[in-house]
Regions:
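Active-site ExK catalytic segment of metal-dependent nucleases
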Residues: 107-111, 119-131, 135
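Mg2+/Mn2+-dependent nuclease catalytic core
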Residues: 130-154
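Nucleic-acid nuclease catalytic cores
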Residues: 151-180
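Non-catalytic C-terminal interaction segments of nucleic acid-processing enzymes
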Residues: 175-206
Length: 206
């Protein structure tokens, strides 16, 4: 099998997804009659799971375009020791649980089919339609937890590459500058950041 740069393929898929999202949301927003209605609308994406599903469409298109096969994409995976019998990194899953204090669930895994080697890529995502601050949780704190998870996965050799994905439809990033928090943290930990601050939904009410 040829060397697979899953990160590069995911970046290309991300660009295509973002362009498609803005185009479709632009069409949907034509029927909206007020800013309040636009702010409350959750078109296409409701949460991180939806984001991964939509991104997956474009990732598999990239694989087909590049004549690549035997690559798997998995969503919302718990990295439990009992689930990875035969994988070379399996012993490190106990270390991962110890480091993080619990069995982590990752938003996205890209792996070679039927391969016992480390994953090609793991990614965590945040999809914001509103403020992430509630009770004791903050958007900044959630991002930092995701990045710690990715750093630990990478440093333990469970995944070859790690990526953080940040999507916003012109509500949270625009108001609270969470984008810069993610940028600075990803730079510090040498993690690739894929981000999109979609302004299309509210563009008519600038």
């Amino acid at each position: 099998m040829p060397d697979i740069n899953a990160e590069e393929l995911l970046e290309k898929a991300w660009d295509e997804f973002c362009n498609d999202y803005d185009k479709r949301v632009g069409e949907y927003s034509e029927s909206v009659t007020s800013r309040a209605e636009a702010e409350a609308a959750h078109w296409i994406l409701w949460n991180e799971h939806d984001l991964m599903v939509q991104l997956g469409r474009f990732f598999y298109a990239q694989l087909a375009r590049n004549s690549l096969s035997k690559i798997e994409m998995h969503i919302d995976v718990k990295l439990k020791y009992s689930s990875f019998k035969g994988y070379k990194f399996r012993p490190r899953l106990k270390d991962l649980r110890k480091e993080l204090g619990k069995v982590p669930e990752v938003d996205l895994i890209i792996a070679q089919e039927d391969s016992p080697e480390r994953f090609l890529l793991c990614a965590e995502a945040k999809c914001y339609h509103y403020s992430g601050d509630r009770y004791q949780r903050t958007a900044k704190g959630d991002i930092e937890k995701d990045l710690k998870r990715l750093v630990t996965i990478r440093d333990l050799g469970i995944a070859e590459r790690v990526v953080f994905i940040l999507f916003d439809d012109y509500y949270w990033i625009q108001n609270e500058d969470i984008e810069s928090v993610a940028e600075n943290a990803c730079k510090e930990h040498n993690i690739t950041l894929l981000k999109h601050n979609s302004k299309v939904k509210l563009e008519r009410w600038k």
